Amino acid sequence: MLQLTTYRNLQVFLVIMTAIGMSFALFFLQRYMGFSPCPLCIFQRIGLMIMGGFALIAALFHPKSMVIRLLLWLGSLAGIGWAAIVAGRHVWLQHLPADQVPSCGPGLDYWLDTLPMQQVLKEVFAGSGECASIDWTFLGLSIPEQSLILFSILILTHLLILWRIVRPATPKPLAR
């Protein structure tokens, strides 16, 4: 009988969710709707890609070593955790009163060209006016709110994967 919650199937689920999320962002929101991603959106995508990369390695190579599985899990969790934190900050910026919204600044490309990485991170998390605007909603949720829900589901999936990694192996019943 096929178990949907096996280690490999859960990793494949993460890879599929990464592909769907990135495809939705790139093809629908950017190409079809014409939205340019703000710096916080770009950082969320980076986190999703990191998670997807580690999950892809785990799904393809299906390591037997618990240490390797835990390292891949930790890398994947770090990626999606990063994305969730950034999405949470993004949602917070969108719910600020209008008089507290930061002003628009130069784009991420300019910051990367002129500032050290530590300062770039500070500027991105400070937010800008473009990060606080709500351009599109679905079911009453903005894009960052939808992303935060997806990232929360993926974090719960990571907890299930951790359980699959560390749970003691159950002995198989003896054949009669």
Swiss-Prot record:
This chain's protein is named: Disulfide bond formation protein B
The protein's organism comes out as Psychrobacter cryohalolentis (strain ATCC BAA-1226 / DSM 17306 / VKM B-2378 / K5)
| SUPFAM superfamilies documented for this protein | DsbB-like
From the record, give the cysteines joined by S-S bonds.
C38-C41, C104-C131
Cellular compartments annotated: Cell inner membrane
Alphabetical list of InterPro entries matching this protein: DiS_bond_form_DsbB/BdbC (IPR003752), Disulphide_bond_form_DsbB (IPR022920), DsbB (IPR050183), DsbB-like_sf (IPR023380)
Tell me yes or no: is Disulfide bond among this UniProt entry's keywords: yes
Pfam families from the entry? DsbB
User: Quick one: which gene encodes this?
Assistant: dsbB
Gene Ontology CC entries for this record: plasma membrane
